[in-house]
């Protein structure tokens, strides 16, 4: 199969839809590319530019999880916060991010991964602007929630797009680059946060996202085809699973953070919240297992945990993340004091 010398993702998406050219142009942003067009794009050198866009988008949201830590002492001082408020600023982003990953991944399969990527960029940019303009704790925490929602849209869309757009040996290379960016961005975050805070103020750690996201949005329309996954199953979208996972994870995070301030004596609010979160998460697992047995689309395939490599791999990743983010939060405050 021959390749076009200048094949854009808009061309791929438009050509994938039968009908008049003007109709294709009107739906180019959301049209889903078919297998032939994806294969043609995958053979084009332009696929590496698409990978660059996806990698930078991934790096931006991962970096935002660690860049705030170094700026916390300045934020605490200028906004008059206590340690619990500082915890909310860092933790709420990761909590929302994690709670929505399963849901957003399914949404990308159904509505298009580039579509989800673009939506995530818009949401993440909006959250960054709100964060940069914040003058108190409440709007800053709300902004971090918005950023978490955007980040949860971006990460799975980049991973699944890489899987769909690359073939054979190129796929292994692309996944290697994806993993390297994810690890490297987390390490660069504290360094970049320190530089920006020192020379431009803590607001700069959020303003820096805006021009990057705008450029990525435009380039994604040009270089990243819109792919989708299978959406088989008669059970529809797992709304209850979304609610259970969000409430469960949110309750656990709230209990842990507030427990540091109020204490964990029963029946204090943190303890009750932790118990509620645990019960809701158990209900989430049981519900997901029921949907799996009924062959309905599920947010989490709990049968995967029967594989030792999957279970131990996720356990290891969790322990590493706990240690990493604990240090990112505590170390800057300790060194400043």
Residue ranges and their predicted role:
Residues 171, 211-229, 246-258, 276-292:
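C-terminal membrane-cytosol helix-exit motif in multi-pass small-molecule transporters
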């Amino acid at each position: 199969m021959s390749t076009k010398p200048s094949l854009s993702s808009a061309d791929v998406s438009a050509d994938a839809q039968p009908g008049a050219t003007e109709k294709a142009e009107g739906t180019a942003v959301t049209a889903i590319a078919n297998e032939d067009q994806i294969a043609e794009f995958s053979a084009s050198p332009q696929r590496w530019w698409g990978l660059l866009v996806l990698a930078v988008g991934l790096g931006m949201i991962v970096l935002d999880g660690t860049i705030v830590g170094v700026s916390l002492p300045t934020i605490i001082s200028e906004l008059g916060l206590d340690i619990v408020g500082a915890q909310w600023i860092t933790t709420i982003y990761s909590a929302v991010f994690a709670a929505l990953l399963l849901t957003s991944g399914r949404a990308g399969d159904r509505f298009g991964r580039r579509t989800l990527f673009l939506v995530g960029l818009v949401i993440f940019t909006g959250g960054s602007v709100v964060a940069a303009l914040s003058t108190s704790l409440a709007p800053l925490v709300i902004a971090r929630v918005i950023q978490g929602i955007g980040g949860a849209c971006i990460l799975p869309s980049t991973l699944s797009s890489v899987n769909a757009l690359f073939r054979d040996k190129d796929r292994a290379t692309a996944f290697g680059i994806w993993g390297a960016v994810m690890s490297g961005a987390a390490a660069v975050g504290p360094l970049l946060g320190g530089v920006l805070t020192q020379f431009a103020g803590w607001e700069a750690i959020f303003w820096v996202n805006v021009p990057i996201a705008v450029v990525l949005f435009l380039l994604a329309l040009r270089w990243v085809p819109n792919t989708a996954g299978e959406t088989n199953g008669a059970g529809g979208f797992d709304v209850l699973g979304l609610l259970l996972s969000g409430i469960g994870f949110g309750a656990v995070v709230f209990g842990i953070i507030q427990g540091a301030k109020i204490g964990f004596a029963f029946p204090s609010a943190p303890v009750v919240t932790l118990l509620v979160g645990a019960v809701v998460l158990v209900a989430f697992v049981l519900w997901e297992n029921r949907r799996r047995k009924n062959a309905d689309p599920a947010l989490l395939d709990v049968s995967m945990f029967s594989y030792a490599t999957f279970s131990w791999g996720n356990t290891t990743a969790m322990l590493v993340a706990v240690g990493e983010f604990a240090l990112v939060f505590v170390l800057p405050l300790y060194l400043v004091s």
